[in-house]
Amino acid sequence: MGNKLERELHMSGWLRRSGFLLSALLLLGLAAAAPASAAGPGAEFKLREDADDVLISPDRQIRVEQYYADKGDAGFQYQFWTFDDKRQNASLLNPGESIDLAGYPAGFRFSPDSQWLVRMQKTGAGFQDLFLYRRKEMQFSSATKKPLSEMAWDYFWNSPASKKLHRNPKDRDSLSHVFAALVKGMDDNYAWLGVHWPDSRYIVISLNFDAQGEEHKLPYIRDWWCAYDLKTGAFSVPAAFAEHNAKAYTTPPPKRK
């Protein structure tokens, strides 16, 4: 009987230990499955508190905040977070980005229906990229696999419009002051352009670069427009842009002898 009691006590202790172990593993698994952004910015990152650095969505339910960390000689690293109106549901817009891409503050624009967000990211003197995010409930995540600006440049260099520049599209990485921007009017569906587009359907992008540093200067573009369709994911150049884009091509003056 003594041996039987010892076996039962031993089994009971083993079950308790196993239960504790399983509970611990379950908690660890749940923690690993939780979004990395749920906790919000780390202590190293400080909030930029200027009014221009915080943006509230048109429906007043989402706010964008910018945080920075001083990395010494390397510069500053920025994180861009969204929160709901109770400052909960923290979501990091740019996970994994280094100082090379997120070394400056950014500008942001919401679509009128608060379902889309564009980030205008300076990457150096005269250089800027665009990133597009889409809303799901109270959080935003990347809407495209590539930056929106890279997609716009792909469209330009593969279109007949680029042939006027007499440049090799393969050399695009060496261009100077490559700058993609938003044309004003995203917040009211570009009413000032005289177009009558569906609400929150299009984003109008301005593409720019110059010939600085080129020994034999070739034509370049300043403020060439294209439209991105948020519903279909396609780019186009509406007829209303024709006159404007015709003036976007710039030919450098001949080099003085």
Where are these regions (language model features)?
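N-terminal secretory signal peptides that target proteins for export/translocation
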Residues: M1-R17
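Bacterial N-terminal signal peptides
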Residues: G19-A31
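Acidic, small-residue rich beta-repeat scaffolds with periodic aromatic anchors
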Residues: A31, A38-L55, A69-D70, A125, ...
